[in-house]
Swiss-Prot record:
Signal peptide: none
A Pfam family reported for this protein in Swiss-Prot or TrEMBL: US2
Protein family according to the UniProt entry: Belongs to the herpesviridae US2 family.
InterPro entries reported for this sequence: Herpes_US2_varicellovirus
Biased composition, class Low complexity, residue ranges: 167-180
Residue ranges, compositional bias (Basic and acidic residues): 245-256
Protein name (record): Protein US2 homolog
Gene that produces this protein: 28K
Residue segments, region Disordered: 100-120, 167-186, 236-256
UniProt source species: Suid herpesvirus 1 (strain NIA-3) (SuHV-1)
Length: 256
């Protein structure tokens, strides 16, 4: 049957815009989306009807660490090799696959390593999103319907959104988060219609602002703002003062 549903999991600002590259947003934001994607996948798999099983495949950018997705079988968590914009505030070095904050242009402060991500060679690699969908539609993975999750920035998601007849709806100003966009015969599946569900975290424009030509001080302020955004979406944060073990649970991340 091939791909019958696609869920695009990405970041989104208040105007419905998504980052062009993974490096335009702090890696902690991608970490939250990765964990949410895995939790949603597991929840749907448990609630699925045993008579009509559905396969789940999670495709992500090679610049995003797998996180809990590493618990899935290797064949169901492929990657597409993407390359960060050289002007993005965060970038990955090709040799070590180390994600680093880009240093200021004047060289007053060196780049700051943020985390190490497993090299893409540890995962099944697709040449592109479209080729991967064609592979799934070929029946190589059986006849069960497939739910494809796409996790990444515009350089990965646009290949699907632009292939649909109403692609402008996803990036239009004021586009609602979690909107269900029905696509009529986009050429990605033999089905008459394909549901593309766009899920994102509402964010401020500062999250995706380019800081390569700004001062390091502004970059630091945006980084702190991103961490504050993360801590309100489900991370365990340390409480200052008071009794107890000093840890409290922040509100859970909700994406509708």
């Amino acid at each position: 049957m091939g791909v019958t549903a696609i869920t695009v999991v990405t970041l989104m600002d208040g105007s419905g815009r998504i980052p062009a590259f993974v490096g335009e947003a702090h890696p902690d934001l991608w970490k939250v989306l990765t964990e949410w994607c895995y939790a949603s996948l597991v929840q749907q798999r448990r609630a699925a009807d045993e008579d009509t099983p559905r396969q789940h495949v999670v495709l992500r950018s090679s610049e995003i660490a797998p996180g809990s997705l590493a618990l899935l079988p290797r064949a169901t968590r492929p990657v597409v090799r993407t390359r960060s914009d050289p002007t993005a505030p965060f970038y990955i070095t090709t040799e070590t696959h180390e994600l680093t904050r880009r240093p200021p242009a004047d060289g007053s402060k060196p780049g700051e390593p943020l985390r190490i991500s497993p090299p893409p060679r540890l995962d099944t690699e697709w040449s592109s999103v479209i080729n991967g969908i064609q592979y799934l539609n070929s029946g190589a993975r059986g006849t069960a319907p497939i739910h494809l999750w796409i996790l990444g920035a515009a350089d990965l998601c646009d290949q699907v959104l632009l292939a649909a007849s109403r692609s402008t709806a996803a990036g239009a100003p004021g586009a609602p988060t979690g909107a269900r966009l029905t696509r009529r015969r986009p050429g990605l599946t033999d089905a008459d219609a394909l549901d593309v569900i766009v899920a994102g975290i509402p964010a401020t424009r500062a999250m995706f602002a380019r800081v390569h030509n700004r001062s390091w001080r502004h970059a630091g302020e945006w980084t702190e703002a991103l961490h504050a955004q993360i801590v309100t979406r489900g991370d365990v944060r340390r409480r200052r003062g008071g009794r107890g073990n000093g840890r409290e649970r922040a509100p859970r991340c909700t994406i509708s």
